[in-house]
């Protein structure tokens, strides 16, 4: 295909149907998350959770037959994707002879399933219809996958379908078993049965339950019999074991009703099927997870919080490297003469702005020049002769250090001089706060550079692409009029601030209870700003979230008094306004675990907060509940509207 005007606007890979482009834009770095669990993810249910926009759907679709076959065909023509092929091979989906050995059966959890609960009142009837439809969809996807693979092997689908049989039919619905006297069924029998079941259920839903459905469905077992059918040992081809392993992949499980979601989890965790099962769903700390009681993560299932995994405990650059690769792949498809995205983002300030800021700080800090204690520090500040950003950060760090020392109740006497060597370690730890204070005290740009944009993404690929697309538009505009210089820090920040303001305005129009959510977040963000700009920078680099203890979270779950707060928090998580860092401890090992709710980084832009993690304040549920209360003026304004 031809070049794309703005490759960052070519939205999330799950939305495009071009296999070539899907592969070209896919970054293999994300597969390391699965590789770390390679011994478990095919023998235990795998649950992948994240905020919306992470790329869960794209991850699952990579392992479908069509994409795997296309990836294999790339090995000679597209050497730049050999790393992706190697990564997929390391997960055993493709062998060293480039044959598909495992394949994903992609099952999206659409609204069709939840519609079942709208047309039938009986709970058992709901469950039977739900499982009947789910089984038919799984079988249909299985056969469509086989059809594609057989076609690729130049085999006749209809002829081969009769040759593939299911040996053990003991778990089948009674009515299906009774239709056949032979001790096995061909896939053609299952194919016809699956189609007939789906037609009956769709007719029932389309007629709002006013017509009856086939009695054979009513006699169905309340089981996911398709799981048993598709185990490798149960499928025979011309009497021999089948050469493919299947991974059933449920995408967006959160779109099901609570009853349906719980039913799937209970069935999978209790029945221990002999087939690989992967599930993706949105992260929600406030969902009732009692269905997992009696089971243990890593023993009965594998639960991966994707943001946690890519955040990197030992390598903090995992996510930024991941985004750097995505950027490189996207830039290859641009139709403009912009060679490098990162090089078009300047990190250099106007020399005069830096010099003015340094001279202003030197003058401001001279009030401590008469103090013996700070003599060496002030002399160092006044002796700086290089007017650059590094010098400015050193002066700001010294300024913060002096304020900390002044406010410390256990400070040394004023006549005891602080040695320069005593301050060096402290000053190095204050660099993030110094950089933040360059915006607060010196009015310099803070939200700029590729490194900052990766942090603004909040570990969310979709968000990164949105921000990058805005900056790229400016690059295009400048290239048209032959302006070759990169975007200045000020211009980058202006574009990013416009993005944040637009996102903020969308809350009121795009989310139910949007104004209440804005009120709730606004109060917390203003409080965080007030804490972050304290002259002694007690939280490095600032406060960008709040923490709730496990006992307080239990109140939120159990006490109906807080139902409104619970709804607002769940909306904030669902719409990626808050991200979660679970089960953290503060203090001793015996202390209560804390769940930290971090503001999405674009909210930090809106309220002039730093972009670091780690700075948060503990909040009681009662305090948070007060934050959702609007003042009378706001209420009257909404009534007038």
Predicted regions and their residues:
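Conserved P-loop NTPase "ATPase switch" module shared by AAA+ and STAND
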Residues: 237-258
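Phosphate-binding P-loop
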Residues: 35-43, 241
């Amino acid at each position: 295909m031809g070049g794309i005007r703005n490759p960052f606007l070519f939205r999330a890979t799950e939305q495009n149907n071009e296999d070539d482009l899907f592969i070209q834009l896919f970054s293999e770095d994300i597969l390391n998350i699965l590789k770390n669990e390679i011994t478990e993810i095919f023998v235990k249910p795998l649950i992948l959770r994240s905020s919306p926009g992470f790329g869960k759907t794209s991850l699952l679709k990579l392992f479908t037959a069509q994409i795997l076959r296309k990836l294999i065909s790339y090995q000679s023509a597209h050497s730049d994707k050999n790393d992706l092929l190697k990564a997929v091979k390391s997960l055993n989906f493709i062998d060293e002879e480039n044959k598909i050995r495992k394949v994903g059966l992609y099952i999206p959890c659409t609204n069709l399933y939840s519609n079942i609960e709208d047309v039938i009142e009986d709970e058992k009837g709901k469950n039977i219809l739900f499982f009947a439809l789910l089984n038919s969809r799984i079988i249909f996807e299985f056969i469509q996958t086989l059809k594609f693979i057989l076609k690729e092997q130049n085999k006749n689908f209809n002829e081969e379908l009769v040759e593939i049989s299911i040996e053990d039919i003991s778990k089948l619905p009674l009515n299906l078993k009774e239709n056949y006297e032979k001790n096995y069924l061909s896939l053609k029998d299952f194919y016809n049965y699956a189609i007939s079941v789906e037609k009956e259920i769709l007719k029932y839903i389309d007629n709002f339950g006013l017509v009856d459905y086939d009695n054979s469905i009513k006699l169905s077992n309340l089981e996911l019999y398709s799981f048993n059918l598709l185990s490798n040992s149960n499928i025979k081809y011309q009497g021999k074991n089948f050469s493919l392993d299947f991974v059933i992949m449920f995408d967006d499980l959160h779109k099901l009703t609570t009853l349906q979601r719980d039913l799937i989890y209970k069935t999978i965790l209790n029945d221990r099927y002999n087939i690989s099962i992967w599930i993706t769903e949105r992260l929600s700390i406030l969902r009732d997870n009692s269905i997992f009681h009696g089971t243990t993560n890593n023993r009965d299932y594998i639960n991966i919080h994707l943001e946690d995994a890519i955040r990197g405990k030992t390598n903090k650059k995992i996510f930024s490297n991941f985004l750097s690769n995505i950027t490189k792949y996207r830039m290859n498809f641009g139709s403009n003469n912009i060679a490098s995205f990162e090089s078009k983002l300047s990190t250099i300030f106007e020399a005069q702005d830096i010099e003015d800021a340094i001279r202003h700080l030197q003058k401001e800090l001279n009030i401590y020049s008469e103090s013996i204690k700070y003599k060496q520090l002030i002399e160092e500040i006044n002796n700086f002769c290089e007017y650059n950003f590094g010098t400015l950060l050193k002066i700001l760090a010294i300024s913060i250090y002096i304020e900390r020392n002044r406010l410390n109740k256990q400070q040394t006497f004023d006549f005891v001089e602080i040695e320069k060597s005593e301050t060096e370690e402290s000053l190095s730890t204050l660099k993030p706060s110094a950089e933040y204070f360059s915006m607060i005290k010196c009015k310099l740009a803070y939200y700029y550079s590729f490194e900052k944009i990766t942090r603004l993404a909040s570990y969310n690929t979709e968000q990164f692409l949105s921000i990058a697309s805005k900056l790229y538009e400016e690059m295009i505009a400048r290239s048209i009029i032959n302006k070759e210089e990169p975007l200045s820090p000020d211009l980058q920040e202006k574009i990013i601030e416009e993005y944040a303001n637009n996102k903020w305005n969308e809350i009121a129009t795009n989310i139910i209870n949007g104004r209440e959510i804005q009120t709730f977040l606004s109060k917390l963000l203003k409080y965080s700003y007030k804490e972050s700009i304290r002259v002694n920078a007690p939280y490095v680099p600032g406060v960008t979230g709040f923490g709730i203890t496990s006992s307080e979270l239990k109140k939120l779950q159990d006490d109906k008094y807080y139902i409104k707060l619970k709804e607002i928090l769940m909306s904030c998580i669902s719409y990626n306004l808050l991200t979660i860092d679970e089960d953290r401890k503060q203090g001793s090992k015996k202390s209560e675990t804390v769940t930290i709710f971090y503001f999405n980084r674009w909210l930090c832009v809106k309220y002039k907060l730093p972009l670091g993690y780690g700075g948060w304040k503990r909040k009681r549920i009662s305090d948070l509940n007060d934050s959702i209360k609007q003042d009378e003026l706001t209420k009257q304004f909404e009534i007038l509207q």
